[in-house]
Amino acid sequence: MQSAAWGTKIVDASKVFKPPGSGPFPVALILHGCGGKTPFLEAYAQTAVEAGYAAIVVDSFKPRGISTLNAKLFVCTGTTLHGVKRAADLFAVLAWLETQAWADAHRVFLAGWSHGGWAIMDAYASGENAARATGLPDADPRRLRTQVKGALLVYPYAGYPGLTTRQGWGGQGPRVFSVLAGKDQVVGWKHPSRALERLTRDGLSVDTLFHADATHAFDDDRANDPRARYRPDLFDQTRTYFGRALTETLDAL
């Protein structure tokens, strides 16, 4: 399947938010974690709308026939749909955006939580091998360079078999904002820190908000991991940080 067709399937399963008016609007793509699309991400979508963006809360599972149970059993355990394969969704939605009059397809901001952050990182790290790595025959790494202006990585998975720490992004990429949790019992903070340090060494601009007392999924009041502790105060801080990242990205253009 070609990018635009897969992008249509992805967006048909996803939820789109828009500011008032006809646009074209810059667009924030919001990628869920391994447990699937959950309601708390819609609060981040609203933050994007308040910053003047349209937002798409991307559902990567429904078009693939992955149920919530199977996501927990197989995606969260790393058995299926590694980040580099899910990265196909990014290339596809970027292609789809170019067909939408309401979207400014060349002012895109990517935001990923946990597994969604992994997908963003592997999309960049796959480089010129994007088509082979993602399985999307026309996946074009130039889309990332020309259409995406900023990225937010929230407690991203960055261990094996993630590509960023080992390969980097080829010294090319948008400004990166990140949120790490000091008591993250799922992805930790050391592996994500190493990946971000690699990007910094490669010359990218990287900014980090570190919540020392936060667990994984601290911003999700319905987290599927019983070890997660919901922190509404840190959720608010992270939404504010996201809003600042969105605004600064537009202001820098």
What are these regions (language model features)?
Residues 165, 188-198:
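Short alpha-helix in the alpha/beta-hydrolase fold that links the catalytic acid
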